A protein has these predicted regions:
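N-terminal pre-catalytic "stem/leader" segment of glycosyltransferase-like enzymes
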Residues: 1-80, 280-281, 324
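Conserved catalytic-core segment of nucleotide-activated headgroup transferases in glycan assembly
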Residues: 21-23, 148-150, 158-216, 223-228
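A charged, aromatic-enriched C-terminal amphipathic alpha-helix characteristic of glycosyltransferases
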Residues: 283-287, 296-330
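Short beta-strand->alpha-helix junction loop in the catalytic core
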Residues: 126, 141-154
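Nucleotide-sugar-dependent
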Residues: 177, 246-256, 269-278
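Acidic donor-binding loop of glycosyltransferase active sites
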Residues: 235-251, 264
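Extended catalytic core of nucleotide-activated donor transferases of GT-like folds
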Residues: 40-118, 122-129
Length: 332
């Protein structure tokens, strides 16, 4: 079954994956987040209902704070065509969902969309009861797939060339990201273990000032100015031994998914991919801290963590498994 993913009014250009996901350096959107759903099913990602092929049988409709009215019009058009329409929150972190539904009008529109759909789809277990309570007749839980089963998306680096810590989070101002705490703890590990530390700066001058204040005491702290093209970002990540974060936002887990493509452990988050692939719950910072130190110093523990996470990813998160789970939407 091919899936059309529709993001009404979105900024990402239309893309069709009928020939597969392609290679990382193609000039197109990477197969991450909801593009991954389109890619693994050899479907398409669209920003206007007019672009969705007329005979599309199943559409995944992305709901955002600013597109709910457009989404409702699109849903009505698609249902009139005979398409099955499943709804989902485009941004599904706990703080993002609270922002989406923190207005009476938006909550009413969201509930109308849920009740008018064929069902809901969520990449996190935490949203299953919410979508059901808002009116979805059925809710499917499908973790975000990653192309761990496609050799061209293997960004691994030889173990002997890996060193240090890559901080996976950003956004100092979002409390549930715990980004500052993650950076400070990583800085301490870096100085104690004499290993490199890389942090992405996505917040311009303000973020740079915070990071530079830490770098004065730690010459091993490297500030990477964002944004980077996705393949280049992965090529930086894979030079390190672990990905470290303390994100408690209950997100789908893209950072952990990125770590899977780099064949490296991700420690400290409570996202869906963190939980499935790495056994993380993000609840105990002390345990995460000890685990990170172990993986930085114990080669056997590192290799075991990589082997186990890759096995779980192939079983539950691969493109092949994603396509199988999405086929259930067509049969629903």
């Amino acid at each position: 079954m091919t899936l059309a993913v529709l993001n009404p009014g979105g900024r990402d250009p239309d893309i069709v994956f009928s020939g597969g996901v392609g290679t990382p350096d193609l000039p197109q959107h990477a197969p991450v987040n909801f593009h991954a759903f389109a890619a693994c099913s050899r479907g398409g990602f669209f920003r206007s209902v007019r672009s969705v092929p007329e005979k599309t049988s199943v559409v995944l409709l992305l709901l955002r704070k600013r597109n709910l009215r457009q989404a409702l019009e699109a849903l009505q058009t698609l249902r009139e065509r005979g398409s099955k329409v499943f709804v989902t929150c485009k941004e599904s972190g706990s703080h993002q969902v609270a922002d989406l539904l923190g207005d009476t009008t938006r909550l009413e529109l969201f509930s109308t969309l849920c009740a008018s759909s064929n069902g809901g789809l969520t990449t996190t277990t935490g949203l299953v009861p919410l979508l059901r309570a808002c009116g979805c007749p059925v809710v499917h839980h499908v973790p975000t797939p990653y192309p761990v089963d496609l050799p061209e998306w293997d960004f691994s680096t030889p173990f002997e060339k890996r060193r240090g810590i890559f901080v996976g989070t950003r956004e100092f101002a979002v409390p549930s990201r715990n980004h500052l705490a993650a950076v400070v703890l990583a800085d301490e590990m870096s100085r104690e273990l004499d290993c490199p530390l890389a942090v992405m700066n996505t917040e311009g001058r303000r973020g740079g000032m915070i990071l530079k204040s830490l770098r004065r005491k730690n010459p091993l702290l490297f500030i990477i100015e964002a944004p980077l093209p996705y393949p280049d970002y992965l090529r930086v990540m894979t030079l390190h031994r672990i990905v470290w974060q303390l994100d408690s936002s209950h997100v789908p887990g893209q950072v952990a998914g990125d770590a899977l493509l780099c064949r490296m452990p991700c420690v400290g988050g409570n996202g869906e991919v963190d939980r499935v692939a790495f056994g993380g719950d993000g609840e105990n910072t002390e345990s995460a801290w000890l685990r990170a130190r172990e993986l930085l110093q114990n080669d056997h523990a590192w290799h075991t963590a990589v082997d186990e996470s890759q096995a779980r990813a192939l079983e539950y998160l691969s493109f092949e498994q994603g396509a199988r789970r999405l086929a259930d939407l067509g049969a629903a």
